[in-house]
Each structure stands twice: as C-alpha cells, then as structure tokens.
C-alpha cells in the first residue's frame, strides 16, 4: 500500500480511537485548530470553527454511553495536501447497532494529517 495512504488511514484510525476511548485530548490532537474546520454529527446542525467543534466533542465524550466502531467500505483519495476518507461507521452500543455514512477530510501540515471536516449521516434501512 502507498505509504501516504497508510498515513491518512492512521490519522483516520486515531480519530475513531479517540472517540471510542472517550479521550478529549486525543480528539484535540487529530483536529486542525482553525476557523476552517467543519463538523456534522449525525442529527446535528453544521458546526464551524474549532472552538465550537471542540465543545461538541466534550459534550459527546463526557456524555452517557460508549460506542464501538467497526469501520467498513473505506476509500481514500488524495490530492496534494488534501485527503478524504469515505467509509461506513458501523456503531455498536448498548442500544444496538446502526450505520453512519461518513466523510472525513484531512489537510497535511508538515508530515501530519489533521482533520478539517467530518460529516456523518445515518443510513436509513431500505
């Protein structure tokens, strides 16, 4: 596998590891702290800028329940210093299971890929 793709997938895995472990510091480390960051949690309105996104993650990670992610259907595309990962987040929690279709956009800063946009949409059964 291309080492750049491996780096992007490692950054993406770090995002989900931070979520699963409910580690706000780890979540902070995977995001770019800028005005251009955007996040859409399933069922939430669009959140813009790092301070607002950080507060949303604090609320989620300190809230009740735990999520385990089984990531499937991953695809990576890279164009210069921008990369995006599309995937299915298969969630397992105390309430059952569900799938969220997600897109994560990363920007390379030096040799680090930082998350600049996350969008998750629930998959409705047909």
Regions inferred by a protein language model and the residue ranges of each:
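A beta-strand edge to alpha-helix "cap/lid" segment located at domain peripheries
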Residues: 1-32, 36-126
């Amino acid at each position: 596998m291309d080492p750049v793709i491996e780096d992007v997938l490692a950054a993406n895995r770090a995002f989900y590891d931070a979520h699963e472990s409910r580690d706000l510091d780890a979540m902070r480390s995977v995001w770019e702290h800028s005005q251009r960051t955007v996040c859409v949690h399933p069922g939430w309105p669009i959140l813009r800028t790092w301070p607002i996104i950080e507060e949303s993650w604090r609320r989620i990670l300190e809230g009740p329940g735990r999520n385990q992610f089984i990531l499937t259907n991953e695809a990576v595309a890279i164009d210069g210093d921008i990369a995006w990962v599309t995937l299915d987040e298969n969630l397992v929690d105390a309430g059952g299971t569900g799938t969220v279709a997600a897109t994560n956009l990363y920007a390379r800063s030096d040799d680090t890929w930082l998350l600049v946009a996350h969008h998750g949409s629930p998959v409705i059964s047909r």
